[in-house]
């Protein structure tokens, strides 16, 4: 219950942060915002683009879901706001356009968490539906919000780091100029990867051993029984 309440509030705050981020990028890093949305031509009433496939030769997007004027609205709270397109920036200063896919994935994971936590909140508010809190579909959906939220964070990180390319400090220092030449970096990276792999496998094994044939609902019922709560 507490997890879903906190999750619902957190997703709302994340949406607010996303709105603020769009406005910041519109003013400070417009090429980054344009890359996120595959926005090529400078115009007002710019559409917000979800999903789709880009033809990089023609800059045409197919199979996308577009919300008319929403990119302009996110940029400055007005459908008439002019959003600068990728065609108006030097090509050697543009981020890789793959960032759009990370944007889609981040938003999808965030929306999933918002919908599940919102449904759970609705179930709590309506007495006739409260018995659904222990329904398998609800419990499995809640379980999926854990990895979904982590994936949203990771995709957001990819989005941010790749979106600022080719700059370390925008307009002053490129990544190619700041990249370290120190030896041993490859070895350290491999060792860290192996360490995390061992931790993942070990953690999964321990958790499976702990909870196999021991459903959490049994522990919950035992606690309720000890408290004398039969509801």
Regions picked out by a protein language model, each given a short descriptive name:
Residues 105-122, 195-203:
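Hydrophobic alpha-helical transmembrane segments
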Residues 17, 21, 198-216:
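Membrane-helix cytosolic exit motif
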Residues 1, 114-154, 208-219:
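Juxtamembrane interface at the cytosolic side of transmembrane helices
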Residues 55-111:
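Individual transmembrane alpha-helix segments
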Residues 6-75:
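Aromatic-rich transmembrane-lumenal/periplasmic boundary elements in polytopic membrane proteins
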